[in-house]
């Protein structure tokens, strides 16, 4: 279900998950997508533009619910993020940290089934998807740290240059008198 979960009460959401588990074939998949409140713009602003949203639904809560209610495994995926930000060394501005986290997330939950059918989905469950706040904040910090290292290096070089020029300052003072 795409953008359904955040419109339901917790009781109705649990009923939906239980019914999905009951009706799915063995090793079947339930996919629930919702706004990602880890994205600060979504969590503090755009989520509330839809008055039918019940409450923000953290991905960790939805992932917990599907496991607690009987699904064999689940995976949280970040979705709908900016393509340039997906690149490992994409833009790392402060605004990217605040707004670039995947604006939506999906929880894929798999019902228990025979081992071979379950194994055919292992690749999907092993891969990482989307952009998290931690990932973007770390990218930003790495960029900041690199700039700081370059600044320190330039300051050290400048100090050496000033020391090399010290005798010339003395000579210059002789001619100014």
Language-model regions, residue ranges each:
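Conserved SAM-binding loop
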Residues: 1-43, 56-68, 109
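Short, solvent-exposed loop/turn segments at secondary-structure junctions
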Residues: 37-39, 79-83, 112-115
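Short glycine/proline- and charge-enriched loop/turn segments
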Residues: 43-50, 89-91
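Donor nucleotide-sugar recognition loop
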Residues: 52-54
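Short, P/G- and charge-enriched loop/turn segments at secondary-structure junctions
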Residues: 62, 91-98
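Conserved S-adenosyl-L-methionine
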Residues: 70-83, 94-95
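Short hydrophobic/aromatic beta-strand or adjacent loop that forms the aromatic wall/cage
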Residues: 101-107
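Boundary detector for helix-to-coil junctions that initiate low-complexity/charged tails
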Residues: 108, 112-177
């Amino acid at each position: 279900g795409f953008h359904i979960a955040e419109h339901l009460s917790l009781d109705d959401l649990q009923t939906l998950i239980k019914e999905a588990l009951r009706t799915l074939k063995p090793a079947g998949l339930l996919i629930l997508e919702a706004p990602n409140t880890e994205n600060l713009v979504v969590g503090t602003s755009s989520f509330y533009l839809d008055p039918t949203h019940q409450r923000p639904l953290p991905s960790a809560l939805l992932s917990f619910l599907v496991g607690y209610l009987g699904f064999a495994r689940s995976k949280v995926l970040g979705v709908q993020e900016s393509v340039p930000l997906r690149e490992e060394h994409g833009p790392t501005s402060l605004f990217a940290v605040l707004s670039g986290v995947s604006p939506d997330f999906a929880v894929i939950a798999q019902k228990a089934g025979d081992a071979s059918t379950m194994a055919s989905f292992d690749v999907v469950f092993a891969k990482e998807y989307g952009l998290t706040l931690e990932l973007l904040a770390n990218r930003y910090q790495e960029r900041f740290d690199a700039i700081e290292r370059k600044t320190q290096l330039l300051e050290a070089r400048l100090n050496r240059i000033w020391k090399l020029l010290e005798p010339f300052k003395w000579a210059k003072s002789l001619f100014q008198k």
